[in-house]
């Protein structure tokens, strides 16, 4: 995507029109998202579609973002990976870890399901934070529309943007980006430590939320969410 990318002048108006036709309840949030991308077009994620990559910032792209913004908020069930297991893994488990042959198939299947569970935890974390933060003006950038940023907030009084990136673990691959430009710093936070049994909720940025965010509340949210979509 070229550095010269820009959004059309009536991008915010188009954003409202497109989202009104999809889900009017999201129109205000999506309009602010497009307002942000209009000011920082270089922060826009590269579309997967090659056709759309040549139309970034145009009306068709704004509609594409609107659909992605909406669809990514719909309930999503965990699904097992479709990849075929590597049989050499079974050999390693048997010889190096003394796993008996009769247990290998069960362990491989449990591993597949565990991977599916791990893959959705990051999404569940963002959904939980969206439920807690959006009532106070933060916007979940659902649909991976913004590079290295998961939540944005516009401070109208000071005409400033606040940006937040969240990760499930401290060893999750992080984007190297720490700023968009013009000293717009991306705040970063992770939920759990990979080398010790501890969470990081106490270090959630105070300037982002004064709500009582904690592991117990997050786990309750996850249970309720999953039960509803069974």
From Swiss-Prot:
InterPro entries, A to Z: Restrct_endonuc_II_SinI
Swiss-Prot/TrEMBL GO biological process terms: DNA restriction-modification system
Nuclease found in the keyword field: yes
Glycoprotein among keywords: no
Enzyme class: hydrolase
Enzyme Commission number, as recorded: 3.1.21.4
Alphabetized UniProt keyword annotations: Endonuclease, Hydrolase, Nuclease, Restriction system
GO MF annotations, alphabetized: DNA binding; type II site-specific deoxyribonuclease activity
Catalytic activity: Endonucleolytic cleavage of DNA to give specific double-stranded fragments with terminal 5'-phosphates
Domain of life, source organism: Bacteria
Protein name stated in the entry: Type II restriction enzyme Eco47I
Gene for this chain: eco47IR
């Amino acid at each position: 995507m070229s550095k010269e990318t820009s959004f059309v002048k009536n991008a915010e108006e188009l954003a409202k029109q497109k989202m009104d036709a999809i889900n009017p309840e999201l129109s205000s949030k999506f309009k602010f998202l497009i307002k942000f991308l209009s000011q920082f077009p270089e922060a826009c994620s590269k579309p997967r579609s090659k056709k759309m990559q040549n139309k970034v910032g145009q009306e068709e792209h704004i509609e594409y973002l609107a659909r992605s913004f909406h669809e990514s908020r719909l309930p999503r069930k965990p699904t097992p990976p479709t990849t075929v297991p590597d049989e050499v893994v079974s050999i390693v488990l048997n010889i190096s870890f003394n796993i008996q042959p009769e247990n290998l198939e069960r362990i491989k299947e449990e591993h597949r399901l565990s991977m599916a569970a791990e893959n959705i935890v990051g999404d569940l974390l963002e959904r939980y934070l969206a439920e807690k933060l959006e009532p106070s003006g933060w916007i979940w950038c659902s649909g991976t529309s913004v590079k290295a940023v998961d939540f944005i907030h516009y401070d109208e009084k000071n005409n400033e943007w606040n940006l937040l990136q969240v990760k499930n673990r401290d060893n999750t691959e992080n984007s190297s980006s720490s700023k968009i430009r013009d000293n717009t710093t991306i705040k970063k936070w992770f939920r759990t430590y990979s080398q010790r049994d501890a969470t990081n909720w106490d270090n959630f940025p105070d300037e982002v939320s004064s709500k009582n965010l904690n592991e117990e509340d997050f786990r309750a949210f996850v249970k309720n969410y999953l039960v509803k979509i069974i």
